Structure formats: structure tokens, C-alpha cells
Amino acid sequence: KNTLLLLFILINLPLLGQENQPVNDSIVVGETKIDSLYREDQFYFGFTFNLLLNRPEGIRQSGFSGGLQLGYLRDFPINKKRTLAIAPGLGWSINSYGQNLLVTENKNDESEFYILDNENDYSRNRFTNYLVELPLELRWRSSTPESYKFWRIYAGVKASYIYHFKSRYEGEGNNVTQTKVEELNRWRYGVMFTFGYNTFNFHFYYSLNPLFDANTTEYNREIGLHPLKIGLTFYIL
């Protein structure tokens, strides 16, 4: 009986070893080890030039308006070749807009909006916002497990929240800073599109809802302002 038990154990040892072996998702080509379950473009950062569209009469941009964005997108391939994927993520951005809309408040702590004309002498009027972002992309790429250089076309939507806003006016003997504006739409919703090859990728984002739900104090014009961002995005890993 002991001999039969010993033979049974010896026969099954190789099978037990195979069961405990980790699954290898890599393919060896020559001396190169290739990951067949690769993911792409999970960390990103980029720079944008910011425009304000749907401006009422009299509002114009001045100086440089730009932004910085960075974040993480979890890549989930949805086909066997891994050239199609969906990617939800979490990001952060800062955006600055130079323009001639003065944001101030009256004695009752109510917001007021004035369009600055050429008769107003000021050196700076700009608002800056800081956002937490939730992007979601549908991705196509010409990637393979062997190559890091490929074409990509990504389209998606993004929800963002402005957790800090600052409007800063600097004029002759008068500086005004506003951080609490009730008419500000802190929740932002927009569509985005990215395309490019290898390192350089063009990025576009358009906000579907206006920045302010308010009218100008003096002329009673709807402010609106829909940000459009145009820039470059870079991906890592």
C-alpha cells in the first residue's frame, strides 16, 4: 500500500506544479519579451490655449489665456487586437482667462458684472479656475504589442468641478478679487477629441454649459461664455 501511495504522489507532482504556475501573458520573440495584454496611454498631461466662445457684445479676450491638465485614465481594451478601448479616469486642471469682464459685488454681497471698455484704465483683469475632472474616452489606435509608435484617435466626454475660482482685477488705485460667485457654474460638462501620432497629440475640449448663469449689470446682456481649449496632450505608459 505504501508503495502504491508513493507512486501516485510521484506521478501527480508535475501536474501539481503546473497548477501552481502563474499564467504567463507574455510572448517571447527572439530575446524580446512582449506583453500580449498591454494597455496604452494611462497617464497624461497637456497644455492648452483657452478661448471663450458665445461672448456677448462688448466682451473680448486679452493677453494670454492658457491651461495645464494632467491625470490618469484606466485603459480597458474591448477587442482581441486591443486597438479599441474605453478609458475612464481622474484628472486635475488649472485654466486662466484674460478678458474684460469685471466681476465684483454690491453692498448686499450680490455679484455684479461690468464690461470694461477702452475708457477704463487697468493693467490686469483675469479669472482662474482649478478643477477636478472625470474624463471618459472611447479609443482607437493602430498599436501592436511590439511597437510604441502608433496613430491614435480618442473621443469622449468630461465632467469637471471647479473647486476654486478667482477673479482678479488690477486698476489704478483699485484692486478687486472675487472668489465666491453664486452665478458661477461650478459643475462643467463638455466633449473632447484627441488625435495624433507617437509623442505629439492635438487635443480639443468644448464646454457644453456656460461659465456663468448671469447677465451683465449695466446692459443686461446674457454673459454665457463657453470655454474652448486647444492644445497638446502627451501620454505615458
What positions do the PLM features span?
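Residues on the lipid-exposed face of transmembrane beta-strands in outer-membrane beta-barrel proteins
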Residues: L70-F76, L90-W92, V132-W140, A155-A159, ...
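Predominantly the C-terminal beta-signal and adjacent terminal strand-loop region
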Residues: T32, Y38, K180-L237
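Glycine- and aromatic-enriched membrane insertion/assembly motifs of diderm outer-membrane
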Residues: Q42, L51-L52, I59-D117
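Extracellular/periplasm-exposed beta-strand and loop segments of Gram-negative cell-envelope proteins
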Residues: P56-G63, G98-N108, E112-N129, I162-E172, ...
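Short glycine/proline- and aromatic-enriched beta-strand/turn motifs that initiate or cap beta-hairpins
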Residues: Q18-D75, Y235-L237
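Short loop/turn motifs that connect adjacent beta-strands in outer-membrane beta-barrel proteins
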Residues: V29-D41, P77-L84, S143-W151
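Transmembrane beta-strands of outer-membrane beta-barrel pores
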Residues: F47-L53, L90-G98, W140-S142, V157-F165, ...
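Residues that define the transmembrane beta-barrel architecture of outer-membrane proteins
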Residues: R39-D41, S62-L68, L84, T128-L134, ...
